[in-house]
Each structure stands twice: as structure tokens, then as C-alpha cells.
């Protein structure tokens, strides 16, 4: 069971980071249709961030104070997952947000009271992924060499993202039982990630 405030603080800052990354991509994309699709995804991340912030405020806590312990680590994660061009960065947001949203939805089941269902519904809401996938598919179709580069980049992203997921777990200190508890969750996350990559025609 995750501790409520650290869970909310980390989840909120991750959504804020996703919004910032997508906003940067909007400024780098030339095609107006693609800009709109990425902007919609950025708006969805911001809405999720604001929803989590509302939960923090509902408890009478300051969102900045609750997010602060996670800022440096997530900022570092953002640097690691910023691509060499906007297409790599867009895939990075799709991969990392997909994995982490799925992960935090699963963790939400352990939150007290009715917070868990609210957060799970919020994180599971439409995040504009269909539009992002459309943009990526168009780019891959226009550049035959892009697919292999993005596939390799996507594989690298998974390891860094799962480290962030592990940092959100409340572990008992018993390595064997902790691993037994974590393994099924991570197996499900990887399966969902593989389906997303397959939808782009990329090898996970």
C-alpha cells in the first residue's frame, strides 16, 4: 500500500513533466495537424496534474511541498528521456507516460478511502494518446529509417521508466517477497507497453 501524500506528489509531478515535454514538442513540430494532436495530449496531462493537485489540496496540504521531494529525480528522468529530435521525445512521452500511468493506476487500489478510485479514473481518462500515435505513425511512414531508431530508443526508455516505478513502491525489505509482489505488476506493464509499440509497428 503506497503512502498517500508521496504517491500524490510523485504522480502530480510526473504529469507536470509530461505536460512540459509535450509542450516543447508542440513548438518543434511544423505540421499544424500534428501540433494540434500533441497539444491535446499536453492539455490532458495538465488536466491530470490539476486533478491530482486538487486531491492534495483537499487534504489541506501544499502541492509544492508535496511534490518537492520528487522534483530532482523526475527532472533527471526528463533529461534522460529527452530525445535527439522531437519524434524521439514524443515517443518517450508516449512510452513513459503509458507505463507510469498504468503503474500508478494499479497502485491506486491500495490508497485509503475513495481516493484510489478517483485517481485511477483520472489517470485512466483519455490522454490524447490516439493523436500522438497518429503523429508517430505518420512520421514512421514518411521515413523508413525512423522505425529502427525509434524501436531502439523505446527499448532504452523502458529500463529508466521501471526504475521510476520501483521508486514509488513501499517495499518491506524482504527481497524475495518484494520481488514476488512486484514481478506480476511489471509483467503486465511490459505487456501493455509491447502492445503500444506493436501498434506503431515497432519491436519492443
Please give the residue ranges for each predicted region.
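Amphipathic, well-ordered alpha-helical segments in soluble domains
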Residues: 14-22, 48, 69, 96-103, ...
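Extended alpha-helical coiled-coil scaffold domains characteristic of the BAR superfamily
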Residues: 15, 89-101, 186, 190-201
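Acidic/His metal-coordination segments adjacent to aromatic residues that form catalytic metal sites
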Residues: 1-9, 70-93
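A contiguous pocket-lining binding segment that forms or flanks enzyme active sites
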Residues: 105-162
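Alpha-helical scaffold segments that form or flank carboxylate-/histidine-based iron centers
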Residues: 3-8, 32-47, 89-90, 114-131, ...
Amino acid at each position: 500500500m503506497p503512502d498517500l501524500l508521496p504517491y500524490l506528489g510523485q504522480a502530480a509531478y510526473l504529469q507536470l513533466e509530461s505536460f512540459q515535454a509535450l509542450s516543447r514538442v508542440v513548438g518543434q513540430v511544423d505540421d499544424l495537424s500534428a501540433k494540434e494532436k500533441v497539444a491535446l495530449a499536453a492539455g490532458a496531462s495538465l488536466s491530470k496534474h490539476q486533478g491530482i493537485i486538487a486531491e492534495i489540496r483537499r487534504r489541506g496540504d501544499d502541492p509544492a511541498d508535496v511534490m518537492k521531494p520528487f522534483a530532482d529525480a523526475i527532472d533527471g528522468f526528463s533529461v534522460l528521456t529527452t530525445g535527439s529530435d522531437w519524434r524521439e521525445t514524443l515517443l518517450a512521452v508516449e512510452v513513459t507516460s503509458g507505463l507510469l500511468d498504468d503503474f500508478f493506476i494499479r497502485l491506486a487500489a491500495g490508497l485509503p478511502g475513495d481516493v484510489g478510485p478517483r485517481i485511477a479514473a483520472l489517470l485512466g481518462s483519455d490522454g490524447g494518446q490516439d493523436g500522438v500515435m497518429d503523429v508517430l505513425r505518420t512520421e514512421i511512414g514518411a521515413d523508413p529509417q525512423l522505425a529502427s531508431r525509434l524501436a531502439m530508443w523505446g527499448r532504452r526508455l523502458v529500463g529508466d521508466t521501471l526504475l521510476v516505478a520501483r521508486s514509488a513502491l513501499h517495499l518491506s525489505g524482504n527481497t524475495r517477497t518484494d520481488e514476488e509482489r512486484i514481478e506480476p505488476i511489471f509483467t503486465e506493464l511490459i505487456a501493455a507497453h509491447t502492445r503500444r509499440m506493436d501498434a506503431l509497428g515497432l519491436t519492443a
